[in-house]
From Swiss-Prot:
Any one GO cellular component localisation term in the record: proton-transporting ATP synthase complex
Subunit relationships: F-type ATPases have 2 components, F(1) - the catalytic core - and F(0) - the membrane proton channel. F(1) has five subunits: alpha(3), beta(3), gamma(1), delta(1), epsilon(1). F(0) has three main subunits: a(1), b(2) and c(10-14). The alpha and beta chains form an alternating ring which encloses part of the gamma chain. F(1) is attached to F(0) by a central stalk formed by the gamma and epsilon chains, while a peripheral stalk is formed by the delta and b chains.
Entry-linked InterPro entries: ATP_synth_OSCP/delta_N_sf, ATPase_OSCP/dsu
Record lineage: Bacteria, Pseudomonadati, Pseudomonadota, Gammaproteobacteria, Pseudomonadales
Recorded topology in the membrane: Peripheral membrane protein
Compartment(s) of residence: Cell inner membrane
Gene Ontology molecular function terms on file: proton-transporting ATP synthase activity, rotational mechanism
Keywords carried by this UniProt record: ATP synthesis, Cell inner membrane, Cell membrane, CF(1), Hydrogen ion transport, Ion transport, Membrane, Transport
Protein's name in the database: ATP synthase subunit delta
PANTHER family noted in UniProt: ATP SYNTHASE DELTA CHAIN (PTHR11910)
Role played: F(1)F(0) ATP synthase produces ATP from ADP in the presence of a proton or sodium gradient. F-type ATPases consist of two structural domains, F(1) containing the extramembraneous catalytic core and F(0) containing the membrane proton channel, linked together by a central stalk and a peripheral stalk. During catalysis, ATP synthesis in the catalytic domain of F(1) is coupled via a rotary mechanism of the central stalk subunits to proton translocation. This protein is part of the stalk that links CF(0) to CF(1). It either transmits conformational changes from CF(0) to CF(1) or is implicated in proton conduction.
Gene name of the record: atpH
Family: Belongs to the ATPase delta chain family.
Amino acid sequence: MAELTTLARPYAKAAFEHAQAHQQLANWSAMLGLAAAVSQDDTMQRMLKAPRVTSAQKATTFIEVCGEKFDAKAQNFIHVVAENDRLPLLPEIAELFDLYKAEQEKSVDVDVTSAFALNQEQQDKLAKVLSARLGREVRLHAAEDASLIGGVVIRAGDLVIDGSVRGKIAKLAEALKS
């Protein structure tokens, strides 16, 4: 994964810098998201791996599949990525682009997993507290996992806060073992 990220980084950075300079971050994010989804299609993956298909043919086919969703600059970007045989890296490129975009917008995606469904009021309160703690706008994504028994697990980038009963039991069990 780290190697793929290293290979994808220059493309993501170039796309981000272009999109930022032209105030098109949302458009490019959507375009790269579509490109990532198309590149993960089984039929498209077979075509991308086919040794007899040239990079120009791969780019042209890719652009045709995406239709009018790509402007001229985006099509050129796909051609450059294809020339360097990096179309399979589009999911990583899109992910890095979105990280750069979030950093620019001072926002962060936060995944909150709870044992029981959180109502909208609880989600809003949690988002407000996390926003104050992280110093960023928080986009909250809530999920349920009954195996937590109670409490929540919060993931925001590299930060993980495990306030679940399952996590506390695991820590207690580890302490008893040592």
